[in-house]
């Protein structure tokens, strides 16, 4: 259910991420931080849950099976809340349309990878349904007066799946591994934190000292998944990292070393992944929670419809066709929920590759596309975009001119720039077997033909698209990408997509590479005062819009089909955190 969700989105994004210069002073406890954060809102929410809200805490396609870790006994739950493993004795089954390319917590970035990681591993903090950061493996934290040193208290009742206790040394090791491997989201903290400045003060206290003020630091920690140091080193192979070998990379390709609610049970990269409940999870378990979770890669809509109607799936992916959702609405034992999000569907335009390196060409593309048909016919229920940031963010710039369908203007822009009909040929890439994206590509091709631009459609697997993104030359001219906050802060939208340091990923397929954009992002990150930071964000959005850096097609209202007896789903405004299966139950 989504009653009042639009207002909640707006309320909780009211002022963007917070470092909170006033509240983070003089002892600055986590509780004071959260009180202020709750007013200003680190990120937004569209709540959708048929059962209780979650506790604690974009898209198709080498090879090996994986085994999971063994659970050993430990305390039942956190603060006496849990029942230590009350079991529904059942399996939760879901489909995804994109393979799990990696399950190494130092490497994962996309939605399926994060879905797997947040269920096998824990972070220090967790984004709740309102986008606020709440304690997770860290039971509490404080921030120094100069906003540079963050001190975390690690829970004393948490254990890894190996049975080893979670300690401050594991957190320190995780950061070292994260930076040394230097993949995944390591760039988020590049220049902000040096691994040498993470110190295990004692068994349950870890201290991070930043190189500079970094307002979204706490929010980025939802992507730092803590690994079992002993398990990783015990299973390390020879490698480039001295006495740490390969840092357990080969092992963690097919195994887990986490403390999360589920252990890896089996893994077939191309087709499926399954998890088994860690009975001794420190939070305990809701009544009628699932013993096992199975996620199958199924891209064919007729197959999904059949499996749901036969009670062989409990939940669909968010990427099914409109026809599938309409059919499921009329299927006995199935409900379909439409969930407002803060995810934008972008047509990412390669700003560095001719002919789309020409701003005039990008402007023509932007005004030559039929956004209303895209929203109303291809993605019904979606909301109008206005610039790179979803309007539900409180720091959204409502003065941006959002292009509308105006083929006459598009043709005139091209003529003024010296282009004649037939001069321009571009490539458009989208995720193959994704019905919505295929229809969007066909609409784009048709629209561009009307303004004299020839579009070659090249559907690809998601894995291939992510590989193409690593090179400006190989990245196609236009690319379909869903992108929403991967951590609860507006910074995630700007840095990951537009900063030059974050280049050559699927998130940054526009290859903006603009010094002024870089400077504005860095200034916002270093600004503690939320009002001053909001002004920077407004200017940043305006510049990206003026550059026609990419096409902002719509804000997603995603849909899922559910079995009627499944509850506990809660949307959280950080990538894949609504797939935290700990809270899912059989009602």
Where does each model-flagged region fall?
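N-terminal secretory signal peptides
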Residues: 1-28
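Short, solvent-exposed loop/beta-turn-alpha elements that line the ligand-binding surface or hinge
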Residues: 11, 18, 113-145, 224-259, ...
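Aromatic- and charge-enriched surface segment that lines or borders ligand/interaction sites
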Residues: 139-184, 207, 355
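Surface-exposed binding/hinge segments that line
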Residues: 190-240
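Bilobed periplasmic-binding protein-like "clamshell/Venus-flytrap" ligand-binding domains
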Residues: 217-221, 258, 416-433, 477-482, ...
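Ligand/substrate-recognition segments at binding pockets and active sites
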Residues: 269, 288, 300, 415-485, ...
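Ligand-site clamp/hinge motif
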Residues: 278-327, 454
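Append "and occasionally in soluble cytosolic enzymes with long acidic Gly/Pro-rich linkers
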Residues: 356-446, 450, 513-519, 539, ...
């Amino acid at each position: 259910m989504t009653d009042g969700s639009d207002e909640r989105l707006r309320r909780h994004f009211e002022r963007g991420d917070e470092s909170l210069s006033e509240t983070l002073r003089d002892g600055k406890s986590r509780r004071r931080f959260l009180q202020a954060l709750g007013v200003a809102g680190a990120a937004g929410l569209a709540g959708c849950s048929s059962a209780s809200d979650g506790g604690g805490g974009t898209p198709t396609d080498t090879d090996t099976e994986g085994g999971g870790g063994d659970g050993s006994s430990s305390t039942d739950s956190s603060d006496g809340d849990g029942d230590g493993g009350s079991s529904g004795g059942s399996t939760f089954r879901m489909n995804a349309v994109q393979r799990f390319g990696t399950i190494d917590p130092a490497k994962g970035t996309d939605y399926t990878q994060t879905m797997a990681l947040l269920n096998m591993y824990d972070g220090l903090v967790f984004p709740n349904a309102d986008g606020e950061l709440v304690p997770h493996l860290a039971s509490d934290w404080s921030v120094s007066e100069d906003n540079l040193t963050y001190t975390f208290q690690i829970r004393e009742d948490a254990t890894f799946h190996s049975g080893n206790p979670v300690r401050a040394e594991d957190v320190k090791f995780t950061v070292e591994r994260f930076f040394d491997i230097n993949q995944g989201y390591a760039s988020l903290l590049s220049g902000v934190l040096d691994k040498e400045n993470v110190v295990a003060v004692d068994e349950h206290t870890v201290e991070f000292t930043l190189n500079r003020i970094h307002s979204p630091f706490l929010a980025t920690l939802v992507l730092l998944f803590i690994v079992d140091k002993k398990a990783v080193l015990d299973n390390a192979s020879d490698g480039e990292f001295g006495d740490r070998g390969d840092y357990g990379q080969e092992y963690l390709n097919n195994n887990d070393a986490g403390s999360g609610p589920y252990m890896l049970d089996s893994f077939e990269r191309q087709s499926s992944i399954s998890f088994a409940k860690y009975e001794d999870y420190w939070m305990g378990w809701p009544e009628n929670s699932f013993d096992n979770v199975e996620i199958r890669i199924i891209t064919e809509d007729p197959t999904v419809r059949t499996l749901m109607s036969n009670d062989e799936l409990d939940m669909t992916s968010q990427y099914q066709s409109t026809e599938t959702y309409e059919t499921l609405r009329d299927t006995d034992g199935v409900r379909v929920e439409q969930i407002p999000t803060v995810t934008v569907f972008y047509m990412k335009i390669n700003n560095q590759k001719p002919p789309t390196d020409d701003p005039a060409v990008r402007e023509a593309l932007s005004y030559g596309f039929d956004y209303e048909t895209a929203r109303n016919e291809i993605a019904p229920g979606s909301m109008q975009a206005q610039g790179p940031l979803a309007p539900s963010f409180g720091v959204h710039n409502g003065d941006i001119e959002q292009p509308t369908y105006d083929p006459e203007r598009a043709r005139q822009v091209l003529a003024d720039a010296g282009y004649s009909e037939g001069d321009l040929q571009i490539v458009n890439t989208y995720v193959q077997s994704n019905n919505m994206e295929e229809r969007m590509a066909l609409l784009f091709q048709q629209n561009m033909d009307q303004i004299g631009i020839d579009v070659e459609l090249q559907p690809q697997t998601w894995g291939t698209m992510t590989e193409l993104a690593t090179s400006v030359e190989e990245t196609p001219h236009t690319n379909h990408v869903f992108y929403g906050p991967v951590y609860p802060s507006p910074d995630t939208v700007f840095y990951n997509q537009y900063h030059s340091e974050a280049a050559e990923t699927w998130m940054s397929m526009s290859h903006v590479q603009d010094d002024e954009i870089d400077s504005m992002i860095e200034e916002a990150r270093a600004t503690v005062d939320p009002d001053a930071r909001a002004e920077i964000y407004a200017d940043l959005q305006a510049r990206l819009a003026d550059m026609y850096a990419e096409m902002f097609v719509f804000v997603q209202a995603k849909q899922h089909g559910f079995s009627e007896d499944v509850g506990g789903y809660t949307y959280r405004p950080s990538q894949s955190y609504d797939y935290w299966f700990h809270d899912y139950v059989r009602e």
